[in-house]
Amino acid sequence: MTATKLHKKVILVGDGAVGSSYAFALVNQGIAQELGIIEIPQLFEKAVGDALDLSHALPFTSPKKIYAAKYEDCADADLVVITAGAPQKPGETRLDLVGKNLAINKSIVTQVVESGFNGIFLVAANPVDVLTYSTWKFSGFPKERVIGSGTSLDSARFRQALAEKLNVDARSVHAYIMGEHGDSEFAVWSHANIAGVNLEEFLKDKENVQEAELVELFEGVRDAAYTIINKKGATYYGIAVALARITKAILDDENAVLPLSVFQEGQYGVNNIFIGQPAIVGAHGIVRPVNIPLNDAEQQKMKASADELQAIIDEAWKNPEFQEASKN
């Protein structure tokens, strides 16, 4: 996609709670000029209904073509966003979803590529780091054009939690969660800052904030999805807005730095997997990863998180079906 292209087209695969919330966010924010929504045949009418419902919001936002799409509509899309997958149930981890969602992912990616699609994949289905890897393997696309939502939502949760604790605007909090989007993720405390002031320095004026509270704060961030799932069944608003932000960065060629699921080529001593870290993203996908220097404890957590993902991938790829479908 060229940065000067005026008509920008997004295809969404999966019109469940996350997908439909993402579509609503795109309409609300006036992102893209065309949005096609793909669903499985038995849910095609839901996609038709959502497209019609969303189109009624356009007089309040900006013009956009919205419709229930087929896989052949991916051919000239700039971005294909994959939210389709088996939902995470109460008591399930994201990694419990691997077997079910790898098969779904293979079917989706194969059909998208067969359409002649030559844009960028953005993956949000869980476990997102594993499914970003499988999208890369099944598509044969360059690693720069396969992106996972990674720790974008986790980092937003972290910033919001710190903002509430410190009574500042979350937009002035700069802090990252890295690693797996899941149980082995970790907070990069060493680089957290408030408007450029290191968090440790900022806290000197906040004597009532104890270290134990910060540990508890992170645990709340890490476990936020479980909390929400137990209370309302699923998470979708936060990730939908995170996906809209990533979409805008790609379509508008922003070269924005966002925490995404990014291919590893030796950074942090990790290779050949996708995992959450900051990266520059624009019209051609990942421009380059931003390798934040980690302290020893953080580096160990990154390696442990990567090892966990690698073990899951190694086990999954014992399946001959996935081996045969791999193009990378």
Swiss-Prot record:
Keywords: Allosteric enzyme, Cytoplasm, NAD, Oxidoreductase, Phosphoprotein. Catalyzes the conversion of lactate to pyruvate. Homotetramer. It is found in: Cytoplasm. Allosterically activated by fructose 1,6-bisphosphate (FBP). CDD domains: HicDH_like (cd05291). Beta-D-fructose 1,6-bisphosphate binds at residues 159, 174. GO terms for molecular function: L-lactate dehydrogenase activity. Signal peptide: none annotated. It is an enzyme of class 1 (oxidoreductase). Belongs to the LDH/MDH superfamily. LDH family. This is L-lactate dehydrogenase. Its main location: cytoplasm. Pathway: Fermentation; pyruvate fermentation to lactate; (S)-lactate from pyruvate: step 1/1. The active site is at residue 181. The keyword Oxidoreductase applies. Its EC number is 1.1.1.27. The modification Phosphotyrosine is found at residue 226. It catalyses: (S)-lactate + NAD(+) = pyruvate + NADH + H(+).
